[in-house]
């Protein structure tokens, strides 16, 4: 391990002692904001320091075993101990490097997930509905909440566009690599000849901005229009102008919300979505620069990239970024995404570790 990393780990150990001491003071809870920050820092530092302590213990075991080599009667036992200690040190070294990887400040946040039907017309809209169900079922498995923010339904079912809010700790960390093009190959229900059609949807995953603090919205940059909410096919479902459309004039971004109970609720939700989109645009620009520098396949933020294919006749799902193919399409569409999300996170960590070693 590099001396600079060892020094950093020692500093983290010292800081954990300091934070533990501060939390133990009688006046610690007098400033609740500071208390929460210290508690969060303590929770982040503890696993790193514990692994580092195990690392130093393994190094001590190695040194003891090497000393035993000089004793002829202990030589074989010492050789086994040395091999075991070296293997343990290697494992802990890798674990420590992962723990020291820069944290994404957005990882613990709620998300907005935006699904848009692309090529394929009605079939693409139906697939957008399937994707929404897939992410909703995944959220249920993680005990997260799902709220529909805005939905533009198609006449045959499914959605031309739908925005959902997923509320739960770590939602962004698990789903941030879902952004991109999702392609489906299947025989549509309306296809009498049994021919396989290819359709596509675009998914955008955006962390929810913290109470509009992450991004500044100048009221002069916003045009806010109200209109009547409507259901599928355009039929009016209420007689008041409760739906809200917000246009961000500098970028041309438009957000519509009509699923709330009131104009006030729709406006508040639309502002949240707009803030998340603007925040996300800035984040993707930065990611694109970083990805270009390190030739990253994961987390480049490129929405035009086709990331995954769902092939129904073969019961197959393929993630093209990491060449992962799973023959369990039914399970995946029912929200069993853990194998895919874990593989994507592992690949992203490997890229970051490689960048650290450069």
Curated annotation (Swiss-Prot):
Keyword check for Protein biosynthesis: yes
Main location: cytoplasm
Keyword field: Cytoplasm, Methylation, Protein biosynthesis
One Pfam family named in its UniProt record: RF-1
PROSITE patterns: RF_PROK_I
InterPro entries assigned to the protein according to its UniProt record, in alphabetical order: PCRF, Pep_chain_release_fac_I, Pep_chain_release_fac_I_sf, Prokaryotic/Mito_RF, RF-1
Signal peptide residue numbers: none
Molecular functions per Gene Ontology: translation release factor activity, codon specific
CC annotations in GO: cytoplasm
Residue list for modification N5-methylglutamine: 235
Domain of life of the organism encoding this protein: Bacteria
Compartments where found: Cytoplasm
UniProt key word Ligase: no
Modification after translation (UniProt): Methylated by PrmC. Methylation increases the termination efficiency of RF1.
General function of this protein: Peptide chain release factor 1 directs the termination of translation in response to the peptide chain termination codons UAG and UAA.
Similarity comment: Belongs to the prokaryotic/mitochondrial release factor family.
Protein name (database record): Peptide chain release factor 1
Provenance organism: Neisseria meningitidis serogroup A / serotype 4A (strain DSM 15465 / Z2491)
Taxonomic path: Bacteria, Pseudomonadati, Pseudomonadota, Betaproteobacteria, Neisseriales
Gene this protein is translated from: prfA
């Amino acid at each position: 391990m590099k001396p600079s990393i060892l020094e950093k780990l020692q500093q983290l150990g010292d800081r954990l002692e300091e934070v533990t001491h501060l939390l133990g003071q009688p006046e610690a809870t007098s400033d609740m904001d500071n208390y929460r920050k210290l508690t969060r820092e303590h929770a982040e530092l503890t696993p790193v320091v514990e692994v580092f302590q195990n690392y130093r213990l393994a190094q001590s075991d190695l040194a003891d075993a090497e000393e035993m080599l000089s004793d002829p009667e202990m030589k074989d036992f010492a050789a086994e101990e040395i091999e075991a200690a070296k293997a343990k040190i290697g494992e802990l070294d890798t674990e420590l490097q992962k723990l020291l990887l820069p944290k994404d400040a957005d990882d613990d946040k709620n998300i907005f997930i935006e699904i848009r039907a692309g090529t394929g017309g009605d079939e693409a809209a139906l697939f957008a509905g399937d994707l929404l169900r897939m992410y909703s079922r995944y959220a249920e498995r993680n005990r997260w909440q799902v709220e529909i923010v805005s939905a533009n339904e198609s006449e045959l079912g499914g959605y031309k566009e739908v925005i959902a809010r997923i509320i739960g700790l770590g939602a962004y960390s698990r789903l941030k690599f879902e952004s991109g093009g999702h392609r489906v190959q299947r025989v549509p229900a309306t296809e009498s000849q049994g021919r396989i059609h290819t359709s596509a949807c675009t998914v955008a995953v955006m962390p929810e901005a913290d109470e509009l603090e992450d991004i500044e919205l100048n009221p002069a940059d916003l045009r806010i229009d109200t209109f009547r909410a409507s259901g599928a096919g355009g039929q009016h479902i209420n007689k008041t102008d409760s739906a809200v459309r917000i246009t961000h004039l500098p970028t041309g971004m438009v957000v519509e919300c009509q699923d709330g109970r009131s104009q006030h609720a729709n406006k508040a939700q639309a502002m949240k979505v707009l803030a998340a989109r603007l925040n996300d645009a800035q984040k993707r620009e930065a990611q694109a620069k970083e990805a270009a520098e390190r030739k990253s396949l994961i987390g480049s933020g490129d929405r035009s990239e086709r990331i995954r294919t769902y092939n129904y006749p073969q019961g197959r799902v393929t993630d093209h970024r990491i060449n992962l193919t799973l023959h369990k399409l039914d399970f995946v569409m029912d929200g069993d995404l853990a194998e895919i999300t874990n593989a994507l996170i592992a690949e992203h960590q490997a890229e970051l570790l490689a960048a650290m070693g450069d």
